[in-house]
Amino acid sequence: MSLFFLWLVTYYVGTLGTHTEIKRVAEEKVTLPCHHQLGLPEKDTLDIEWLLTDNEGNQKVVITYSSRHVYNNLTEEQKGRVAFASNFLAGDASLQIEPLKPSDEGRYTCKVKNSGRYVWSHVILKVLVRPSKPKCELEGEPTEGSDLTLQCESASGTKPIVYYWQRIREKEGEDEHLPPKSRIDYNNPGRVLLQNLTMASSGLYQCTAGNEAGKESCVVRVTVQYVQSIGMVAGAVTGIVAGALLIFLLIWLLIRRKSKERYEEEDRPNEIREDAEAPRARLVKPSSSSSGSRSSRSGSSSTRSTGNSASRSQRTLSSEAAPQPGLATQAYSLIGPEVRGSEPKKAHHTTLTKAETTLSTMPSQSRAFQTV
């Protein structure tokens, strides 16, 4: 009974074969093992077949040997990349794939048949993809006292991808660890929060993204700025603008003042005083033969003008006496007002006597006013 049970277990194992799991990186070469002892007695009846069941459950034939022929171009995806690794007739029916692609991942089955005997072996192939080069970014303003987030992410690669941040030592004595007040987001390991930035936080930071296939990294520089320096720059710019405006205003005022003074100087000679008093009399050249009589007429006219009203005096003073032509002497005398449109009349002896009497009786102040 025990011998029968041992034979049954041996037959079951030999029939179903073993399960093997292999991990390889994409673009590399892999060999899937499959060994048998069924080809030595009778080689003409030997059949070898490799099958692939992908992650979606679809099954396809990869390579076969039958009737002394090898068929290895059965699928378009693996055409020219699959072959038997060794002498399959001697008992090594291992499959070789080069180069590997992510689509090669799945469950491979090696089936060997000869004269009614079967050997099965199963290999689970996992194709690992290296992380793509991550992209390092900064979120926030790198100013003193603020918080800054370092972001790192790979677009492709076999999960899980592990991210690791560190500082790059640029000078002797610099620490490679992150600043003390740094927090890692465990829900998103590619994010690191730098809290309460100081000038010591400035430097070069490196992010490394890695998995079982390999790793890639990126770097980003953090330069912490003083908040005061930003305020000083803003104040300096404001001061420059205000100074420029002030200078422009002063220049404009000076130009305006000069223009006003020039305008006043040009208009000053043309001013006319409206309150100036009109001339009372005009000197003319009388003839020598009638100088005595004109003096008498002048005195008589002055006497008559004294008794007239103020309006007639103004009209009389504005009149002008025309000079007499053909005079030989150069003597001058005061002439009185003339009535428009009429010749001055000669004073009578009686009239002159009355005028002299009137002048003698007038106060001295009045006489002085009349003789002006």
From Swiss-Prot:
Compartment annotation: Cell junction, Tight junction; Cell membrane
Region named Disordered: 263-372
Positions annotated with a glycan in the UniProt record: 73, 196
Lineage of source species: Eukaryota, Metazoa, Chordata, Craniata, Vertebrata
Organism: Rattus norvegicus (Rat)
Keywords linked to the UniProt accession: Cell junction, Cell membrane, Disulfide bond, Glycoprotein, Immunoglobulin domain, Membrane, Repeat, Signal, Tight junction, Transmembrane, Transmembrane helix
GO cellular component, one term: bicellular tight junction
Record's compositionally biased regions (Basic and acidic residues): 263-280
Origin: domain of life: Eukaryota
Signal peptide range in chain numbering: 1-17
Full protein name: CXADR-like membrane protein
